[in-house]
């Protein structure tokens, strides 16, 4: 049996590994490489895929979405070689790294893509629940932000109902953070001023 000190050091190491991987600002890197300047200077100032889409480059936005998700998936899967607790720590680290990347003043994205990526790495069936909830909400409301909020709310409930308390607790915490990061969107949803999917301007 591993010593408690070693176990704790392993978890801290996994958390740091996840954070470093998650803090790679792909949205910023890709837009600069494409000659589109600093994505933080347009739209919401966010480095995530939604704001990258405001550059008008759909392929770049899709690439940002995929890479931001893969950060979470890779962190969880690599750390899983050292056990589920290490995978959970690394996944959470990647999520936090995306939200608060040290390289750009701790101002990152809103975390939805990385949330999904971590979910794929830790409980792929939960990712299907997320996708289904997102699609249904999007079809009914046409609000991308609301779809993400509903999907992230459903995930910990689904995980808990399947008897996975550890993952349910992790994603409950991550869901709370996603809601906090979307507080401006929530205000606009309540005011009826949030942009709908496909809306111009």
Swiss-Prot record:
It is found in: Cell inner membrane. One of its GO terms (cellular component) is plasma membrane. GO terms for biological process: phospholipid biosynthetic process. Keywords: Cell inner membrane, Cell membrane, Lipid biosynthesis, Lipid metabolism, Membrane, Phospholipid biosynthesis, Phospholipid metabolism, Transferase, Transmembrane, Transmembrane helix. Belongs to the PlsY family. This is Glycerol-3-phosphate acyltransferase. One of its GO terms (molecular function) is acyl-phosphate glycerol-3-phosphate acyltransferase activity. Probably interacts with PlsX. Its EC number is 2.3.1.275. Pathway: Lipid metabolism; phospholipid metabolism. Catalyzes the transfer of an acyl group from acyl-phosphate (acyl-PO(4)) to glycerol-3-phosphate (G3P) to form lysophosphatidic acid (LPA). This enzyme utilizes acyl-phosphate as fatty acyl donor, but not acyl-CoA or acyl-ACP. The chain crosses the membrane at residues 10-30, 60-80, 86-106, 116-136, 166-186. It catalyses: an acyl phosphate + sn-glycerol 3-phosphate = a 1-acyl-sn-glycero-3-phosphate + phosphate. Signal peptide: none annotated. It is a multi-pass membrane protein.
């Amino acid at each position: 049996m591993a010593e408690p000190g070693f176990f704790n050091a392993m978890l801290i190491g996994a958390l740091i590994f996840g954070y470093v991987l998650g803090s790679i600002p792909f949205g910023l890197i890709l837009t600069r490489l494409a000659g589109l300047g600093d994505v933080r200077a347009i739209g919401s100032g966010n480095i995530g895929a939604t704001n990258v889409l405001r550059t008008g480059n759909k392929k770049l936005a899709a690439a940002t979405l995929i890479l931001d998700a893969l950060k979470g998936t890779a962190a969880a899967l690599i750390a899983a070689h050292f056990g589920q607790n290490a995978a959970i720590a690394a996944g959470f680290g990647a999520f936090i790294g995306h939200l608060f990347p040290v390289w750009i003043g701790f101002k990152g994205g809103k975390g939805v893509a990385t949330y999904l990526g971590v979910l794929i790495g830790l409980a792929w069936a939960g990712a299907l629940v997320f996708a289904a909830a997102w699609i249904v909400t999007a079809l009914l409301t046409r609000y991308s932000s609301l779809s993400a909020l509903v999907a992230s709310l459903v995930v910990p409930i689904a995980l808990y109902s399947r008897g996975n308390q550890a993952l349910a607790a992790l994603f409950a915490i991550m869901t709370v953070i996603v809601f906090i990061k979307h507080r401006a969107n929530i205000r606009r949803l309540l005011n009826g001023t949030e942009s709908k999917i496909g809306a111009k301007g």
